[in-house]
């Protein structure tokens, strides 16, 4: 299976640079995964396609302000007690990728040439000091931090949101890169399908008798890593940490046993429950790391339907949705979305891949 099979032409102006003021006011393309039929709506109309007994699976990870801007410092002979460092002034950017024990983080450091083992970096005039202690897979650096106080509070003060590479400017309100149900800190990128939900919409859905289950997968920057290999089977997926609690696994399994559909909000929720599923198709209470790569030919163990954003050409996320609805249906739907001027990627519009399109009058 070739990477080019998942190419579509996307005009640059359709890449959304800012979120809409109304989260649930984005557009929604509904795709019947069996027939390829497409209808157009406003996202809040998703309720038309949900029913009592369905289970909506959310990823409640929380994006941390993982982008740190600092300066390299060099050891100097102490000139006075307590003054053993001098700033060299070389700007260094750190992206926190994965937390390790003992205040150590796996990071991406720019510029990499300056990031040798032993390098020390000052953030916020010394409020936070990082020392590179090792070089690991893909050239990432392990950095040990020293500080006074609470790390999360310092990070909230000094850090910036690590927006996707196709977003060209900082957000005025960094909370718009969080879902309203974000809870467990650890992601370097948002599970963006969830950005369309408001608390009011979630309550409306729950009041319909739809079960809401929460899982956690901390999204890494690897989610933006392009597929470089021509044969997608040669691609190696990045690793991401996930957790499914027993109470949430029970909600999903009970809904499945009762004949309800399992509807994931986002590809991260999908990858989580598929990673935690046993051979009988039931979700286990489990935590660990997953490198699951879902592409056409994959047989879903748990998932029935998917709410997702529009993804990059030739990306692993586009391959995942093609596994659910077929490459032909997905590419055709994407081409129609381009024609209809949908907004793409993280701050863009949404798609609901379902199996029971009901005839409704198009909103547009």
Swiss-Prot record:
Organism this protein belongs to: Lachnoclostridium phytofermentans (strain ATCC 700394 / DSM 18823 / ISDg) (Clostridium phytofermentans)
Complex and partners: Monomer.
Protein name (record): S-adenosylmethionine:tRNA ribosyltransferase-isomerase
GO cellular component terms attached to this protein's record: cytoplasm
GO terms, biological process: queuosine biosynthetic process; tRNA wobble guanine modification
Recorded family membership: Belongs to the QueA family.
One Gene Ontology MF term: S-adenosylmethionine:tRNA ribosyltransferase-isomerase activity
Keyword Transferase: yes
Pfam family, one: Queuosine_synth
SUPFAM superfamilies for this protein: QueA-like
Sorted UniProt keywords: Cytoplasm, Queuosine biosynthesis, S-adenosyl-L-methionine, Transferase
UniProt entry tagged with the keyword Transcription: no
Gene: queA
Compartments where found: Cytoplasm
Main location: cytoplasm
Catalytic activity: 7-aminomethyl-7-carbaguanosine(34) in tRNA + S-adenosyl-L-methionine = epoxyqueuosine(34) in tRNA + adenine + L-methionine + 2 H(+)
Annotated function: Transfers and isomerizes the ribose moiety from AdoMet to the 7-aminomethyl group of 7-deazaguanine (preQ1-tRNA) to give epoxyqueuosine (oQ-tRNA).
Lineage: Bacteria, Bacillati, Bacillota, Clostridia, Lachnospirales
PANTHER family cross-referenced by the UniProt entry: S-ADENOSYLMETHIONINE:TRNA RIBOSYLTRANSFERASE-ISOMERASE
EC number: 2.4.99.17
Main EC class the enzyme belongs to: transferase
């Amino acid at each position: 299976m070739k990477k080019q099979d998942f190419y579509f032409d996307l005009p640059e102006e359709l890449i959304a640079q800012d979120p809409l003021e109304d989260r649930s006011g984005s557009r929604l393309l509904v795709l019947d995964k069996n027939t390829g039929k497409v209808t157009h709506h406003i996202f809040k109309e998703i309720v038309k396609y949900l029913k009592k007994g369905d289970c909506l699976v959310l990823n409640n990870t929380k994006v941390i302000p993982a982008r740190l801007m600092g300066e390299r410092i060099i050891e100097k002979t102490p000139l006075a007690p307590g003054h053993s460092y001098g700033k060299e002034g070389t700007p260094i950017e750190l992206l926190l990728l994965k937390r390790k024990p003992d205040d150590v983080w796996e990071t991406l450091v720019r510029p990499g040439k300056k990031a040798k083992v032993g390098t020390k970096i000052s953030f916020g005039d010394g409020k936070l000091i990082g020392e590179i202690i090792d070089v690991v897979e893909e050239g990432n650096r392990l950095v040990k931090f020293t500080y006074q106080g609470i790390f999360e509070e310092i990070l909230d003060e000094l850090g910036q949101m690590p927006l996707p590479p196709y977003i060209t400017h900082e957000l005025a309100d960094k909370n718009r890169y969080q879902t309203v149900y974000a809870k467990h800190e650890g992601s370097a990128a948002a599970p963006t399908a969830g950005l369309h939900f408001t608390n009011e919409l979630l309550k409306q859905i729950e009041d319909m008798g739809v079960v809401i289950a929460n899982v956690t997968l901390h999204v890494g920057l690897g989610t933006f890593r392009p597929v470089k290999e021509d044969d997608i089977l040669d691609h190696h997926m990045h690793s991401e940490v996930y957790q499914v609690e027993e109470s949430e696994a029970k909600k999903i399994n009970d809904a499945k046993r009762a004949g309800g559909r399992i509807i994931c909000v986002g590809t991260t929720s999908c990858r989580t429950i598929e990673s935690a599923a046993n051979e009988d198709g039931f979700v286990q209470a489990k935590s660990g790391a997953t490198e699951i790569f879902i592409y056409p030919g994959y047989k879903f163990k748990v998932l029935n339907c998917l709410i997702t954003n529009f993804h990059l050409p030739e990306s692993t996320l586009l391959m995942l949705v093609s596994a659910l609805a077929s490459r032909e249906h997905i590419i055709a739907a994407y081409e129609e979305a381009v024609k209809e001027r949908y907004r793409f990627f993280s701050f863009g519009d949404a798609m609901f891949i379902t199996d029971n399109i009901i005839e409704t009058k198009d909103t547009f």
